[in-house]
A protein has these predicted regions:
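N-terminal pre-Walker A segment at the start of P-loop NTPase domains
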Residues: 1-18
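Short phosphate-coordinating micro-motif centered on Lys-Gly-acidic
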Residues: 2, 87-139
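Phosphate-binding P-loop
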Residues: 21-26
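Short hydrophobic/aromatic beta-strand immediately N-terminal to the Walker A/P-loop
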Residues: 28-30
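P-loop (Walker A) phosphate-binding loop of NTP-binding proteins
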Residues: 32-34
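Conserved lysine of the Walker
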Residues: 39
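Conserved nucleotide-sensing/catalytic segment adjacent to the nucleotide-binding pocket
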Residues: 52, 61, 65-108
């Protein structure tokens, strides 16, 4: 399993852009971590790597799911499950969405009530020494 240390939002965003190039065109990235761990910043970097304006990617906590399209045809579906319980998450139809086209990034993925085979799972955490640790985990 891989892990990275980032020391700023800019480094976290840059890592997201690198990871975007590694994802399949219909890949799924599952992000877990505490509030303020950098999940949305990493998602902004993913967007940038897909040719989407990263400033368009905001924490979708209040709208739950947002879709973004890049100038080069890249598609990003960004979901935030923070305020949902597993029953509410199941009612959203996320299984179909995650199987659909485009790169999917799910924040608070630990709230998914089902496994996502083939997805890349990352756990983000603040470090006591500063910065963030992003660790790939078994999905």
């Amino acid at each position: 399993m891989r892990s990275w240390i980032t020391h700023s939002e800019a480094e976290t965003r840059a890592l997201g852009a690198v990871l975007a190039r590694e994802l399949a065109p219909d890949g799924v990235l599952l992000l877990s971590g505490d509030l303020g761990a950098g999940k949305t910043v990493l998602a902004q970097g993913i967007a940038e790597g897909l040719g989407i304006d990263p400033d368009e990617v905001q924490s979708p906590t209040f709208s739950l799911i947002r879709e973004h399209r890049g100038t080069g045809g890249g598609r990003l579906v960004h979901a935030d499950l923070y305020r949902l319980d597993p029953e509410e998450t199941a009612a959203l139809g996320l299984e179909e969405l995650l199987a659909g086209p485009g790169v999917k990034v799910v924040e608070w993925a630990e709230r998914l009530p089902f496994p996502v085979p083939g997805a890349t799972a990352l756990r983000l955490a603040r470090r006591s020494a500063g910065g963030r640790e992003i660790r790939e985990e078994t999905n």
